[in-house]
Amino acid sequence: MFRLLTACWSRQKTTEEKQRNVTIIVIGLDNSGKSRLIEAFQRLIPSKMHKEMRPTQTTLLLDDYQVSIYDLTGDVKGREKWSSYYAQAHGLIFVVDSSDIARIQEVKIILTRIMFDKRVSGKPILILANKQDKKNALLPCDIIEYLLLERLVNETRSMCRVEPCSTIKRIPKRQQKPIVVGLRWLLAAIGDQYSELYTRQQIPNMSISTSKNIRGCGERCLSDSLPNRVRHSNRQHFDKRQHMEHRQHVEQRHFEKRQHFEARQRLIQRSLDARPLKPILQKDGFRIRPKKNMSVTFALDVIMEEGECSRKIGAPTISKPCSSQCYDTKTPDPSVDVSLFKAHKPKKRIETWDTEEMFLEDPREETFHSCD
């Protein structure tokens, strides 16, 4: 008797050890048939119900798995809470209304966003093309083409399967067989990478919980715990503060560089500006004295030979001063006005100095006047 009880206990222990707990979330747009799908699961697969079980959670026993299925709302508010379940789910079931062609683009956008989420990437996904009993329902091949599933699977490395189904009650059970076939495929895909998916779960950080309100009240699933929210909020504030400090530091460096560049430009401009001449210049006996606000043209009273001209500004024209000895020619007749036969020779002029006005003072000027 003791051996029989021991054998029964060991067999029960082995069976319990073989069973794996799997968490699956059912998502999709509103009116896609998620509620009917859960009811079909309960009709076709034995369910393990508990007294504390909430209306949105269903526990099923299939093969060697104890499956906890969570039905999430598909309205706009419900979609905001989907991401709270991605980390804990081993796999996903996405329900598509194959008869609603007008919303297929919306389905494509939402499914792409879900599959590219880092918490979902790599996890198996079962897509159920629901409402195949209607006339205008899309075939699975059309859904694959519209949703670009081949590209999504290759880029996200997530296994995916499209299964046509219909969840209405009036059809025979054998026509609802694709639902069970799809669920078995999903569990097999989870079992192949169960250890990896188990490590990706964040059970200590977050626990899945559902609202006590009945279906239709809008708030079906609320799973964020307060400590995690506070921790996440503090992390966001810290990241923002780090970003602001880094940005201020970069702006300060740019301002200092701009100030240095402007100071250097002013210094270069100042060095390139024309500098005024010295107040008094003296060279070879000539004295140049500047005067303000006047443009002066210089003229020499000394008559120069033709072709004899110095292009250098300020170069003196040297002439011998007159002595007491005079070189007279023939004395003209006093009755004849000699000035009529003399050609007037203009005075030589030197170039104008535009920088400053200057007067030329020749120390030999008195000698020239004495000769006159």
UniProtKB/Swiss-Prot annotation:
Binding site for GTP: 28-35, 71-75, 130-133
Disulphide bridges, residue numbers: none
Alphabetical keyword list: GTP-binding, Nucleotide-binding
Superkingdom of the source species: Eukaryota
SUPFAM superfamilies: P-loop containing nucleoside triphosphate hydrolases
Record has Nucleotide-binding as a keyword: yes
InterPro entries noted in UniProt: Ciliary_GTPase (IPR051995), P-loop_NTPase (IPR027417), Small_GTP-bd (IPR005225), Small_GTPase_ARF/SAR (IPR006689)
Any one GO molecular function term: GTPase activity
NCBIfam families: small_GTP
Protein family per UniProt: Belongs to the small GTPase superfamily.
Protein name: ADP-ribosylation factor-like protein 13A
Organism (species): Mus musculus (Mouse)
Gene name tied to this protein: Arl13a
